[in-house]
Amino acid sequence: FEYMQHIRQIAAKNKVFKTYIGLGYYNVITPSVIQRNIFENPGWYTAYTPYQAEIAQGRLEALLNYQTMVMDLTGMELANASLLDEATAAAEAMHMFYAMRNRDQVKRNANVLFVSDKCFPQTIELLQTRSAPIGIELQIGNASELVWNDQIFGAVIQYPDVDGEINDYREFTAAAKSNHSFVCVCADLMSLVLLTPPGEWGADCVVGSTQRFGVPMGYGGPHAAYFATHEEFKRSIPGRIIGVSIDSHGNPALRMALQTREQHIKRDKATSNICTAQALLAIMASMYAVYHGPDGLKRIAGKIHSATRHLATRLSSLGYTVKTQAYFDTIRIGLNNLCSQELLNQRAIQREINLRYESNGDVSLTIDETTSQVDIKALLDLFAGAAGKDAGSIDSYSTIPFWENFSRSSAILKERVFNSYHSETEMMRYIKKLENKDLALNHSMISLGSCTMKLNAASELMPLSLPEFANLHPFIPSDQAEGYLEIFRELSSDLCQSTGFAAVSLQPNSGAQGEYAGLMTIRAYHLSRGDGHRNVALIPSSAHGTNPASAVMAGMEVVVVKCDENGNVDISDLKAKAA
């Protein structure tokens, strides 16, 4: 009771404004049936990684639904379940493409990855971090001006791009194929409900976030990222893949497939250091698609697009320039000296509205499924008032057809599971049926030990549903997130005190990412001292498989130290190899 009072007081220090920043993070409506029966249900959030398929058939089915949803919407042949976030998913594509270079490319050390300057800024920064230790050079620029050469092995582009623009990349992917280069597309999954999927115009890999499928922003996470590709890449794809098999009685059954790619088996030869990644959030996203079905998703996407079109038309009539030509939910606006960014921002903050302010003086905004007609009127009043004009009244607006030359013609979500459970009762029963096929800590102890074996108390998880924690965008001004910052400061102080270290990073999104961040810090330290040659990592043979996989990603050479049958380090072997 005292704790809940305390945490609510902290939550109250966060300010929940109407936020239109976008950049891969969106306000969502989480269906109550999913929030109550999955997100807040220990039958789902305390289950262990499904290494033992016999006690995980429910979650495996939900994750298979996730893969099917991603494959359908992207137009690809294969998807995993799942990854940590969109930026690291793009980095995983970079690693995969680099490993898949042909013999001639390896021989001439083709090591250049082109990255569109219209990708999200966090994706570009992450690619810069991940590329350096493994010898990949980034070429960042305008995709329409790229001159292909034999040093470029791959490319990363955004669809729709950071300004909301929908580009026709058919010529781009054709040129890439002629150059024997791979193309990764970072795509907004909701836009693909209406938009021609990348799989139909030549993409080799499609990545992105499933956050806007019913998972709150949470000041930046956690959310499940998706990764979709073609069959030819199946032995190089990162992360878990759920496959359909047959049990000992000859009945259909689900299991994790192609595990020989993964760190717990391949270790330093693994395709990635990723283990199970945000499976609970992937399950929530899959259930969002199951609950709404293809027609429901089309209504949601259509509403988002129509509201954006209507807003753009009205802003143009006020004298602003909408610079984005074809768009789904995001527009970039030229102010045309009608007002300054400073004035607009001042008036927006007074009205508790967050927009995205560009370095050249433009303003961008992104519409989402929570945006109502009242919200559109508030935005129009904001822009009109800043220009000294009257926005006038706003009439009900009908659905506006999507751009014909970019419209999707292929069907989505045809499978029975996406066309059966559209009432709360039906959905609740389906979720419960799957839950009953699983073993979680609300049933019994699970006799498997690993980094994920912990029980989050109900009182710890309840605050996650509070709007003051759930509905904050990661790029809002810091004075709107004082509650979060207080928690960060207190947690950082406690961790420093308990570990004896001087500082701590809360950024890593998983244990595997934490060890990678640590190894990258060690690497940076040696480089700062001119000791870049110190690149050997001694790792016990009994260490978790992510350890050697992360060391390789950090550009290190792995030397394995022997262990006894109980996993204890052989000290004599350690001394010999450390000498």
Positions of predicted regions on the chain:
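Gly-rich Lys/Arg/Thr-decorated short loops/hinges at beta-loop-alpha junctions or inter-strand turns
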Residues: 41-53, 71-76, 107-110, 138, ...
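Conserved phosphate/anionic-ligand binding catalytic regions in large, soluble enzymes, centered on
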Residues: 215-228, 232-233, 277-281, 371, ...
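Conserved catalytic alpha/beta cores of large enzymes that bind or transform nucleotide phosphates
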Residues: 252-254, 258-264, 268-289, 296, ...
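Active-site C-terminal subdomain of aminotransferase-like
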Residues: 213-314, 318, 323-325
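Short loop-beta-helix segment that forms the pyridoxal 5′-phosphate
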Residues: 18, 51-55, 72-91, 495-518
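N-terminal entrance/gating region of PLP-dependent enzymes' catalytic architecture
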Residues: 1-65, 71, 265-266, 404-490
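Conserved PLP-binding catalytic core of the aspartate aminotransferase-like
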Residues: 305, 318-348, 367-370
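Conserved PLP-enzyme active-site core in the AAT-like
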Residues: 88-253, 315, 332-333, 346, ...
